[in-house]
Amino acid sequence: MKEFFPVLHTAALFSGISDEELAAMLSCLGARIDTFPKGSRLLRAGESVEEVGLVLAGSALIVQEDIWGNRSILSKTGPGQTFAEVFACAPGAVLNVSVEAESAVTVMFLHIRRVLSVCPSACSYHSRFIRNLLSELAEKNLRLNEKLTHISEH
């Protein structure tokens, strides 16, 4: 996993976290890495998730489909960016979007339950990670709010 540390350090989730802390944190969070070919679905609408996805290489699209099969690309995620964090943080929430590989994509999945509970090892960087997660959620919420404001004006 150390080969991905340069990308992880660009991620808002790991802002202010050293290499040593990062290595310990990835273990604590049950980090796993998967690679998906172009066009494959990483997550499907209708599923529930417990993991945050963080793109390490390649890109993924957040796509919403209506009942007639019309697709809307809501966002694109690239290296250092996350997806599914809102759904993973809300126990029992069901995805209303799918995540698709725009290109071949490598993703690190982090188990959200381990993020939201107190670490049994009392990791000093655990609270920093939670602050980073909240900051990222707030920024995405603000961007969504701006889009809604723009759409409602027309």
Located regions from the model:
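Local beta-strand/beta-hairpin segments that build beta-sheet-rich folds
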Residues: L42, L74-S75, I151
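Cyclic nucleotide-binding regulatory module and flanking cytosolic helices
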Residues: M1-K38, A88-C89, H150
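Short, small/polar residue-rich loop motifs at catalytic or cofactor-binding pockets
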Residues: C28-L29, E47-V49
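Polybasic "coupling" helices that flank or enter modular domains
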Residues: S124-H154
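Cyclic-nucleotide recognition modules
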Residues: I73-N132
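Short phosphate-coordinating micro-motif centered on Lys-Gly-acidic
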Residues: R41-E47
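Glycine- and acidic-residue-biased ligand/ion/polar-headgroup-sensing regions
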Residues: G39, E50-W68, G78-Q81
